[in-house]
């Protein structure tokens, strides 16, 4: 208890590396690889336990108790992680070589397209150096076949993009090597690296790889950080085409042979529209247009979400949205209170041209102007904008929210003495 975990990540890995399964079946289903987390050296956190109401813990009805968890903190000991493979035919377990260093992370394991070889992601404690190991599962011997370093840190959200093609010769993935999130392809034999997409915008996700036609489908914030387009390009970087038509946020899921895809679209003021298209973008049919929801919303006194930008005293342009009360008019002498909402966490995005409807709309109905501003440190504006907060969390994000409040206070229809701010999670830390 509280020492060894097999195949399920510990708290740090689940929370910070965003995965909950630490095992992988081989392509031929004859081997299973997993991570073993040894928490023996991790210090514990003791929590007082009481009876309570929901749930009611009757064992603590008379006397409170203590429950202990392994809870690593920054600068303290982490779990020691090792990687193992079990062969169902030989019934043998083989430990894989991840190097001598124990104070490191193994944020992912993934089988290559060859069931004889496992790929292990090895990340240093500072999270600025990533190495991909190729191990022969039978011997456990490993070699580094890809490495990447970053002057700030490597974003763990990109780790899931790494895909081994079925031909066994290439690997496609996303990286910030040129300062923007883009798609790359590695030749596994020559180790030559080829950049597939480029430009001063961020790709958001790889949606699928059509190996037969040598094409990759992806989601990009190409026209604006607020938008998402569905695009396709050749793996050689030629023939880039935008498939989505409507401005806003588009996402897609493809059929197994890439003949068709389901596109999900919305914008800030329109709920989801789900459609089927042929691979070239041609519309086949509408699956859901949310007409009933739109009719219901029309019965309420809702107002449109409007986007705006403003420039801070440091010359930084920031994006925001505003929801105004139903009786709002810039020409009136009336001044409105402002409710600012924000999250502001690293690489997050709250200001996007996508559908959402919550209690902020209710506040606007009751006379408040609701405003959200994405400051420095948020996503889809390039690496420099996103990672400016590195090693100084809370500094620039706070300054930008203060700048936003001052900007709002300068508007003729805002009551500058009645501006409040709310945040949740990281946003609560900001407040």
Which residues does each predicted region cover?
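Serine-hydrolase catalytic core recognition
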Residues: 115, 242, 249-431
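Beta-strand C-termini and the immediately following turn/loop, strongest in propeller blades
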Residues: 21-24, 33-39, 73-77, 110-113, ...
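Short glycine-/Asp-/Thr-/Trp-enriched loop segments that recur within the blades
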Residues: 2-19, 101-106, 151-159, 200-206, ...
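A short loop-to-beta-strand structural motif that recurs across blades of beta-propeller domains
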Residues: 82-84, 131-133, 182-184, 229-231, ...
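Beta-propeller fold detector
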Residues: 1-2, 94-97, 142-149, 194-198, ...
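Beta-rich catalytic cores
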Residues: 19-21, 79, 105-107, 128, ...
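Short loop/turn segments that connect beta-strands within beta-propeller blades
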Residues: 87-91, 137-140, 187-191, 234-238, ...
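Predominantly five- to eight-bladed beta-propeller fold
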Residues: 1-23, 31-95, 280-295, 350-359
């Amino acid at each position: 208890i509280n020492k060894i975990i097999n195949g399920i990540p510990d708290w740090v890995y689940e929370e910070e590396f965003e995965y909950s399964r630490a095992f992988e079946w081989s392509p031929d289903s004859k081997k299973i690889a997993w991570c073993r987390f040894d928490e023996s050296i991790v210090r514990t956190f003791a929590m007082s336990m009481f009876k309570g109401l929901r749930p009611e813990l009757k064992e603590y009805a008379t006397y409170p108790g203590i429950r202990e968890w392994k809870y690593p903190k920054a600068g303290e000991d982490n779990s020691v992680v090792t990687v193992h493979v079990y062969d169902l035919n030989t019934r043998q377990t083989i430990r894989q070589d991840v190097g001598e260093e124990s104070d490191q992370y193994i944020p992912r394991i993934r089988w290559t397209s060859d069931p004889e070889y496992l790929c292990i992601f090895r990340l240093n404690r500072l999270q600025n150096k990533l190495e991909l190991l190729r191990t022969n599962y039978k011997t456990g011997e490993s070699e580094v076949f890809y490495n990447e370093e970053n002057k700030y840190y490597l974003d763990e959200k990109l780790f899931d993009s790494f895909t081994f093609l079925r031909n066994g010769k290439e690997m496609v993935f996303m990286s910030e090597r040129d300062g923007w999130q883009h798609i790359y392809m590695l030749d596994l034999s020559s180790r030559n690296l080829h950049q597939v997409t480029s430009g001063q915008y961020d790709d958001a996700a790889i949606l699928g790889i059509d190996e037969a036609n040598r094409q990759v489908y992806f989601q990009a914030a190409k026209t604006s950080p607020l938008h998402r387009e569905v695009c396709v390009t050749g793996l050689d970087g030629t023939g880039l085409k935008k498939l989505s038509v409507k401005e806003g946020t588009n996402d897609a899921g493809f059929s197994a042979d890439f003949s068709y895809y389901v596109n999900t679209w919305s914008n800030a003021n329109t709920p989801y529209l789900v459609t089927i298209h042929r691979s070239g973008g041609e519309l086949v049919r509408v699956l859901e247009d949310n007409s009933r929801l739109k009719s219901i919303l029309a019965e309420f006194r809702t107002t449109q979400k409007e986007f705006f930008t403003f420039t801070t005293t440091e010359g930084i342009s920031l994006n925001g949205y505003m929801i105004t009360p139903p009786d709002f008019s810039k020409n009136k002498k009336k001044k409105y209170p402002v409710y600012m909402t924000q999250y502001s966490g690293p690489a997050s995005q709250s200001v996007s041209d996508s559908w959402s409807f919550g209690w902020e709309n209710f506040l606007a109905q009751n006379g408040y102007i609701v405003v959200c501003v994405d400051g420095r440190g948020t996503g889809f504006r390039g690496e420099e904008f996103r990672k400016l907060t590195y090693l100084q969390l809370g500094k620039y994000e706070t300054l930008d929210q203060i700048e936003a409040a001052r900007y709002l206070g300068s508007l003729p229809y805002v009551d500058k003495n009645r501006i409040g701010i709310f945040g949740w999670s990281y946003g609560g830390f900001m407040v």
